[in-house]
Amino acid sequence: MSYTFSRRDFLKYSAMTAVAVAGAGLLTGCEIQDPNNPVIKKLGYGTTLGTTGGLLKSVDKDSTTGNGVFTFTVKNNSDAPLPMDPNESFVVKVLDKDGNSRWSNYFNLSIEAVPGADGKVPDILPQLPVRTVGEYKVHVPDYAGHAPNPEETLEFTFIPRPAKSPELRITWKILGADLVK
């Protein structure tokens, strides 16, 4: 004996399945994320955006200058060099507990290449060459005086190609409590 699945039954069960899946997403706290603007919520984690990968390794405060020092690794898997202009490629913000911007800096930043294991500084500035991984230290003026409290959030944004695609970015949103060493 066989059962013929009618169009009406198909639509009825499809609708019930869609409602069940949507309800499960609401109950489990399913988070929707924009693939063109990934957000990472932990220090030491990275992601890719197209042919560019990024990893925020550490956030430190330079006690002598008051600057923030963000150690950041970038992988350029593209056929074109990746510009690494600190004043166009990076934005640093501190958000209060409600998510409103309390402090931001996207100008007067500086960047330096981290020396390799042999002690030599690689030639990865002002552009990261094709199919290369580079490690940088991004210096952010006045960060130490505005660093996030435990209930506030640090937002570090990397814009891989600001002139060509300023809307594509990788962002790290890290609670101040997770930055304490």
Each model region followed by its residue ranges:
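N-terminal secretory signal peptides and thylakoid transit peptides that target proteins
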Residues: M1-A18
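Solvent-exposed, conformationally flexible loop/turn segments
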Residues: L43-G46, T65, G116-A117, Q127-V133, ...
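Low-complexity, acidic Ser/Thr/Pro/Gly-rich terminal tails and inter-domain linkers that flank the onset
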Residues: P35-S63
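Short structured motifs
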Residues: G53-V59, A117-L125, H139-P141
